């Protein structure tokens, strides 16, 4: 038998040290990667429960194993909360990730070789939207749309032209690095004009949508997918939503299980249920509003300091800083900011002359710093410090000064207060 007093510390000190160091890094560094956030202690608690022991292949009420009466309650809570939060008629909470949720949709609605029209990775799309290195670009005939070079916004005329030329079976809307509001209805009209399915990947803005601060695609698209972390602030995982269509719902369920997954991760589904309940609370809207205000304040500070923001600003939680005119690579910017304990990710920008491993931009997002309690004042300061470093990336004195400021700010705003 096991004692409940068993701990990793003292048994696997090497592993425990790495975990402790990562916890310190999260407390002592400022996190600006747009896809990262901090899960609440309640979400972390759910992931550490005995639910991890239970196999539950199938769906609530239709399992292939016995002893599922309690995990059925857990999964049903998650499903009903997801439907309520997003105004969906259908929800599948079993996908282990956003990419697996997307894969299930592809396999449910398409056949290998079918044409898919999605956003180019270089213009802000995601790997699963048709990138050649991904299953979506290998198994399917992927055609890519991008941004209007003059406005920096999605080129809907190009989407329309490509749809009429290639007659895709499915159009994918959504992004991983786009700072404006997507016109879901325009995508719907284009999809209808060529008889295509419309899938929306709202992973990055799910929290904003849940709070009613960003247009919802859920009753516009045929199927909507998301992750449950990022702005939703839950565990790492995926979620599929849809408007009422019994045939599509049946296909989606069978493609998640047994199509691409076996047993669901019940401890993660429990954590999803917790996060969804947190997102249903009134203060969640205040949090998401602050996320957007902070992103806007940072973007405007960069612009004031002479940096170019792709699409001219932000109307969500993130933005891309184009460093081409500064003669700076995204890789170097990520490195020097990291030395000051500011974490960002290098990111390709439209017409990027650098490779994806180097890039000419950085992506900046405010979900994590807002969870810590940063407001507009702190975010303006932070953006200014970042500009100080990128203005003279080889100046260790500046990096050291900013690192001190970061240390003081992190101590004022701990992630997990004692």
From Swiss-Prot:
It catalyses: (6R)-5,10-methylene-5,6,7,8-tetrahydrofolate + glycine + H2O = (6S)-5,6,7,8-tetrahydrofolate + L-serine. One of its GO terms (biological process) is tetrahydrofolate interconversion. Its cofactor is pyridoxal 5'-phosphate. Pathway: One-carbon metabolism; tetrahydrofolate interconversion; Amino-acid biosynthesis; glycine biosynthesis; glycine from L-serine: step 1/1. PROSITE patterns: SHMT. One of its GO terms (molecular function) is pyridoxal phosphate binding. The modification N6-(pyridoxal phosphate)lysine is found at residue 230. It is found in: Cytoplasm. The record marks 229 as: Plays an important role in substrate specificity. Its EC number is 2.1.2.1. Keywords: Amino-acid biosynthesis, Cytoplasm, One-carbon metabolism, Pyridoxal phosphate, Transferase. Belongs to the SHMT family. Catalyzes the reversible interconversion of serine and glycine with tetrahydrofolate (THF) serving as the one-carbon carrier. This reaction serves as the major source of one-carbon groups required for the biosynthesis of purines, thymidylate, methionine, and other important biomolecules. Also exhibits THF-independent aldolase activity toward beta-hydroxyamino acids, producing glycine and aldehydes, via a retro-aldol mechanism. Homodimer. This is Serine hydroxymethyltransferase. It comes from Methylococcus capsulatus (strain ATCC 33009 / NCIMB 11132 / Bath). The gene is glyA.
